[in-house]
Amino acid sequence: MKAYAKANIFLKLTGFDSRKYHLLESRFILLKDVFDELELVDKESDSKKEFEIISNFKCENNIIQKAYLLLSRRYNNELKELFSKKSLKLTKNIPVCAGLGGGSSDCASFLLLINETLNLKLNLQELINLSIQLGSDIAFFLSGFHSANVSSCGEIIEEFEDDIPNLKWTFPQISCQTKAVYDEFDRGIFDFQKNNNQAQIYKKLSTKELLQNFKNKELNDLFTPCATLYPKMKSYLQEDFFLSGSGSSVFKVDR
């Protein structure tokens, strides 16, 4: 099963919820050319792990492990039987700490894979309700939408009929830590009401219109704090690249 990456075309921070998590308004688009792959493979006879992930990526305590534990609360016997014979193979291609949602997409694909394999018959809303307990962005990947306006903490998704130009991507060898970038944003000067007003305009425009008519700093509230924390990102900010998420992946319209 393919776990596709995403890009944020705009990302506006609009407040905090009761847990002090940031509220956002964003346009997510699916990147069909950038993906990880998940599959169930026969378990090696000498493996002692109850749930084993085989990967080219360090997987201890990652979000898939958390999803497995969450599902185990309701489907412990079914999962134990499945993973007594199978291991999960995860092939990572999506750059890590790059603002492309790789971990969230992997988690969504794992939930879909288990739902299908064990015939759990969980509907989309039930899967989204599970995903809210695991992290943001997962709901978008569960939806299967190619483009959507996403709000709150990532769990409210509205499909958007979009016009998406070809994008040319650059993946800097810079690991941008999401929490650090958000913390840097919080140290700056911001106006949540202004951000929300801008977001309401952006939500009505196509991706093509957004990238043609607005500057990178206007579209993504995290670009300036990202460049402050990671000075090598400043050149991309100055050269009119657009930032996905909290970085470090950047893009331009491929003209």
From Swiss-Prot:
InterPro entries noted in UniProt: GHMP_kinase_C_sf, GHMP_kinase_N_dom, IspE, Ribosomal_Su5_D2-typ_SF, Ribsml_uS5_D2-typ_fold_subgr
Presence of the UniProt keyword Nucleotide-binding in the record: yes
EC class: transferase
Signal peptide: none
One Pfam family from the record: GHMP_kinases_N
EC numbers for this chain: 2.7.1.148
The reaction(s) this protein catalyses: 4-CDP-2-C-methyl-D-erythritol + ATP = 4-CDP-2-C-methyl-D-erythritol 2-phosphate + ADP + H(+)
Pathway linked to the protein: Isoprenoid biosynthesis; isopentenyl diphosphate biosynthesis via DXP pathway; isopentenyl diphosphate from 1-deoxy-D-xylulose 5-phosphate: step 3/6
Gene Ontology MF terms: 4-(cytidine 5'-diphospho)-2-C-methyl-D-erythritol kinase activity; ATP binding
Annotated Gene3D superfamilies: 3.30.230.10, GHMP kinase, C-terminal domain
Keywords of this entry: ATP-binding, Isoprene biosynthesis, Kinase, Nucleotide-binding, Transferase
One biological process term in Gene Ontology: isopentenyl diphosphate biosynthetic process, methylerythritol 4-phosphate pathway
Superkingdom, natural source: Bacteria
PANTHER family named in the record: 4-DIPHOSPHOCYTIDYL-2-C-METHYL-D-ERYTHRITOL KINASE, CHLOROPLASTIC (PTHR43527:SF2)
Known function: Catalyzes the phosphorylation of the position 2 hydroxy group of 4-diphosphocytidyl-2C-methyl-D-erythritol.
Family label: Belongs to the GHMP kinase family. IspE subfamily.
Protein name: 4-diphosphocytidyl-2-C-methyl-D-erythritol kinase
Species: Campylobacter jejuni subsp. jejuni serotype O:2 (strain ATCC 700819 / NCTC 11168)
